[in-house]
Amino acid sequence: MKNLMIKSWKPLLSLLFGVAVVVFWSVPYMSGLCFQEQYQMFLFDIGYFLERIVLPGGLADYISEFLVQFYYMPVLGGTIIALLLMGIQATSWGLMKQYGMKSDFPGYLLSFVPSIVLWCAMGDQNLLLSFVVALSGALLMGWIHNRFHNRLVKVV
């Protein structure tokens, strides 16, 4: 049992963080979700997609407007935010490992800093989910670039 805890403490810590985010957005700060949901509109239409995609940051806006429409159910909205923040934490950890961070406890805790700062910033109702989506996309592209850069250079 102790060996299992030693091997799985990182995913458990990330899961605990995700549960805390869901509980926060579902119970005490449910009004923040409802506020953002009522002021955003999403149309599942090719014209609306093309109208959004031509603007800078349009893809992030389009994806976030799709996700925000589920905020009318606070648990689902909190889960969406938790998954995005957990993804940012995991991608930050992946980037940190690529740059030589040790796999110890303090090093892993540092990977939570971007997600926690973003969680605090999301308390401002004027910060839209498109910022979170764009940041997670940028981090993911950085991780993919670092992961496959040497392989692509050797092929080309």
Where do the language-model regions lie?
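Start-transfer (signal-anchor) and selected internal transmembrane alpha helices
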Residues: M1-V21
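Aromatic-anchored segments of alpha-helical transmembrane domains
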Residues: A20-W25, S111-M122, V156
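Membrane-interface coil-to-helix junctions
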Residues: F24-L84
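Transmembrane-helix motifs of polytopic, lipid-linked glycan transferases
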Residues: A82-G100, S115-I116, L139-I144
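Transmembrane-helix signature of polytopic, membrane-embedded enzymes
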Residues: M96-V117, L152-V155
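Membrane-interface helix caps and helix-loop-helix hairpins in membrane proteins
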Residues: C120-S130
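Transmembrane helices and adjacent periplasmic/lumenal helix-loop junctions
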Residues: L129, R147-V156
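Specific aromatic-rich, kink-prone transmembrane helix
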Residues: V133-H149
